Amino acid sequence: MIITENQIWDRFNTVKPISIDAKWYEDVYSLELSIQLRFAIGERLGLLADKGWEVIKSLIEKHGFQRELIQAAGLCHQREAYDFLLKILREESIPKINTVRALSCWGAIIPTPDLKNILKEESIHMRLAGLNLLRFKSHLLNATEILELVEDLLDDFREEVVIEVIKILQRRDEEKIIKCISQIAIYGTDPTVETALIALGSIGTKESLIALSSLSRNLTNRTHKQMAYKQISHQYLNL
């Protein structure tokens, strides 16, 4: 019996995802379905955890590394799925961005060398996805390790990348982190300078106050100077 897309959507709208047997999703999945429906099937399979993973594996064997199936592998939160995703991440012939995004829930345990390779990619999408992984792993790393990972990204011409790096760094209070953020406040573009100054204010330590005081004296841009003074006033309230 052939089931239509409308019939599949109708079932989705009337039955809870976890109430549908995983095998049913496998039976109705097809590359001829709309991409929206294929992603919906993948999301529902991900909710089925280990049972969903068994079907996801089977569908990947039949249909290859489809985006919705890679995403589903990440959503099912199974350790075997993590091992699978890490393996295909290391395969040069397979597009990596979907795999990196699927690994997001495992950011804390992804090996540092793999994370470093992700962050070295030139694509903005890869770098942002890699920074999302680093966000979950950074508390397990020391300041030197973090700075080594983001070293190339600090010079990225895309402000969005640099801003995301600052947001990760501002959760730390080590002196070398503060110095790094201060350098961005001196040499960055308007958006990155402003983000860096706010970051120094949010760190709220004596070292970051000293850095802001120096910046308030040495920055040549009037707006940036005023922002540095504003962050100093915030720090005095917190110290």
Where on the chain are the PLM-derived regions?
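Core helices of alpha-solenoid repeat scaffolds
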Residues: 18-22, 52-53, 82, 111-112, ...
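Conserved acidic functional residues
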Residues: 156
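TPR/TPR-like (Sel1-like) alpha-helical repeat modules
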Residues: 214-220
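Structural detector for internal amphipathic alpha-helices that build alpha-solenoid repeat scaffolds
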Residues: 2-16, 26-48, 58, 65-79, ...
